[in-house]
Curated annotation (Swiss-Prot):
Protein name: Ribosomal RNA large subunit methyltransferase H
Native organism: Histophilus somni (strain 129Pt) (Haemophilus somnus)
GO cellular component: cytoplasm
The family this protein is said to belong to: Belongs to the RNA methyltransferase RlmH family.
Keyword set includes Cell inner membrane: no
Positions of S-adenosyl-L-methionine binding: L72, G103, L122, S123, P124, L125, T126, L127
Length: 155
């Protein structure tokens, strides 16, 4: 199973790239973790936000191919590390790849929300989207380590 993190935004600060890559490199070869960056639409005072969301959504969904789509969204379901480890195991048994979607400044398009099979909430807080990349990478790595009895996760 391959996991794709599909996120709006391409020019991240170095600390985001380094933080994400630190966890990305730890994933096992049988569960590669890939970042796909979708260019953000141009935003300005006269920007058509609905059209921008639609374009970003189309690009995100086309990157998903036939993967199980999971959106990162505040109203989604919060998972403990143990629950995320169980989700990871269920996704593996499903036989499809997994695409996790992180929207841009205005969130996810209605099309992305309609296509999702699950919605995951990291927090009731609004988090900066660059930071979410690192939190998701670490959380997935921790869940994997729990399910494989790797010493990274400690009770």
């Amino acid at each position: 199973m391959k996991i794709q993190l599909i996120a709006v935004g391409t020019k991240m600060p170095d600390w985001v790239t380094k933080g994400f890559e630190e966890y990305q490199r730890r994933f096992p070869k049988d569960m590669p973790f890939e970042l796909i960056e979708i260019p953000a639409g141009k935003r300005g005072k006269n920007a058509d936000i609905k059209r921008i969301l639609e374009q970003e959504g189309k690009a995100m969904l086309s990157a998903c191919q036939k993967s199980r789509i999971i959106t990162l969204d505040i109203p989604g379901k919060p998972w403990t590390t143990e629950q995320l480890a169980q989700q990871l195991e269920a996704w593996k048994h499903d036989g499809r790849n997994v695409a996790l979607l992180i929207g841009g400044p205005e969130g996810l398009s209605p099309e992305c929300k309609a296509a999702t099979e699950q919605s995951w909430s990291l927090s009731p807080l609004t988090l900066p989207h660059p930071l979410v990349r690192i939190i998701v990478a670490e959380s997935l790595y921790r869940a994997w380590s729990l399910s494989t009895n790797h010493p990274y996760h400690r009770e």
